[in-house]
Structures are given as structure tokens and as C-alpha cells.
């Protein structure tokens, strides 16, 4: 029997300036089924990245409840938020955020080391994840020695090192040329399926969105299935 990994109730988010008040979400109700790959499209400024930031505990909503797994994200203190981000979530952004003085392998291992796991314990898993994204032979290369697509593939591998339940990906191929974008996107879907993770993908590319299990369009504060 399927179950929901994320439940959102009454989510409200606004931005205010001196001249106007912009409503991003107005009492949004939404759920995400465990094990599904979903995509969110929408116009620039519609709130796609804001949605991911709120779900990821990187930004606060004005009101509403967000339950992700056993975490009540809307009411977590900073210590619990850190635990939520490091253990429950895997994050992939448009920019790779790799440390330039760390090799590909070391960059993949880093989140687990920060979480207090031993280097010996995680090295084998990090190598396996690099194999998943077809970069095992470049494990000792530094970011400057990798192409843009390869750097983003390292970021995909890194997102899985702490065995998260939910992967949040914000335009992960947005800075890549079409050929590299296709490679990275296919590998992201492949590793998500292999490791049985749930994926929430923000993209402007309708072709990529059509490859997910369910695609939603964010329009006027509502997520509508397309």
C-alpha cells in the first residue's frame, strides 16, 4: 500500500514590498507519495524554488503545516532542522557547490563526515555512488579538472551519501548544455530509482517534466497536475 512521505496543509507564503503584497501560496494543501518522482514547472517568479526552500527547511512559511516523514518541518528548532536536512533530505541545486580543494570522492563523502560518520565507513559507499553516476574513474579529480556536467553528477552522488528519503532538485540541469543536461537528468532519475528514493524536481523543461511520474504546474499559488 502506498503512503504519503510529505503532507502539506494550509501553507501560506507572502512577500511584501513598500508598494505591494505578493501572495505565493494561499492555504495550499498538497501531498507527495513515497517513491514517486514528481516535477514542478511554472513561470519564473511563480514560487517553484520558494516551495522547495520551504520544504527543505531553508525558508519559513507564514503559516501552515509541513510533515515530511516523522518531521514536523514547520515547528522544528535549528538543531532539529539541521538533522532533518542532513538525514532525511538530499539536495541538488542548479550550481554544484563542490569544494575546489576536495576531490570528487572527498566532495561526495563530505556530508557524511560532517554528520559524524567515519571515513572508512563511508568511502565504499561514496565510490559506489560515483559508479552510479559513471564517474568512478575520475574519483581523484578536483572540480577544476571536471566538466560542468561531471561536476553536477558529483553533486547528484553527494546528495545520496547520507541515505536520504527525499531528494529535492532545483533546476539541476539549468546551467548545462543540452547534451550534458540530458546525461545528468537521466543519471539522476536512474539513481533515484535504484535507491528507491522520492524525488521533487523543479524544472522549466517540459520534456524533463514529462519523464516524471507526476508533473505539476505552479500557477497562482496552486499546484495543478498536468
UniProtKB/Swiss-Prot annotation:
SMART domains: AAA
Domain of life: Bacteria
Keyword presence, Transcription: no
A GO cellular component annotation in the UniProt record: plasma membrane
Keyword Lyase: no
EC number: 7.6.2.-
Residues binding ATP: 42-49
One Pfam family from the record: ABC_tran
Family matches, as Gene3D superfamilies: P-loop containing nucleotide triphosphate hydrolases
Keywords, in A-Z order: ATP-binding, Cell inner membrane, Cell membrane, Membrane, Nucleotide-binding, Translocase, Transport
Biological function: Part of the ABC transporter complex LolCDE involved in the translocation of mature outer membrane-directed lipoproteins, from the inner membrane to the periplasmic chaperone, LolA. Responsible for the formation of the LolA-lipoprotein complex in an ATP-dependent manner.
Protein family according to the UniProt entry: Belongs to the ABC transporter superfamily. Lipoprotein translocase (TC 3.A.1.125) family.
Assembly description: The complex is composed of two ATP-binding proteins (LolD) and two transmembrane proteins (LolC and LolE).
The protein, known as: Lipoprotein-releasing system ATP-binding protein LolD
InterPro entries: AAA+_ATPase (IPR003593), ABC_transporter-like_ATP-bd (IPR003439), ABC_transporter-like_CS (IPR017871), MacB-like_ATP-bd (IPR017911), P-loop_NTPase (IPR027417)
Compartments it resides in: Cell inner membrane
Main location: membrane
Membrane topology, record value: Peripheral membrane protein
Domain ABC transporter span(s) in chain numbering: 6-226
GO molecular function, one term: ATP binding
Record-linked PANTHER family: ABC TRANSPORTER ATP-BINDING PROTEIN MG467-RELATED (PTHR42798:SF2), LIPOPROTEIN-RELEASING SYSTEM ATP-BINDING PROTEIN LOLD (PTHR42798)
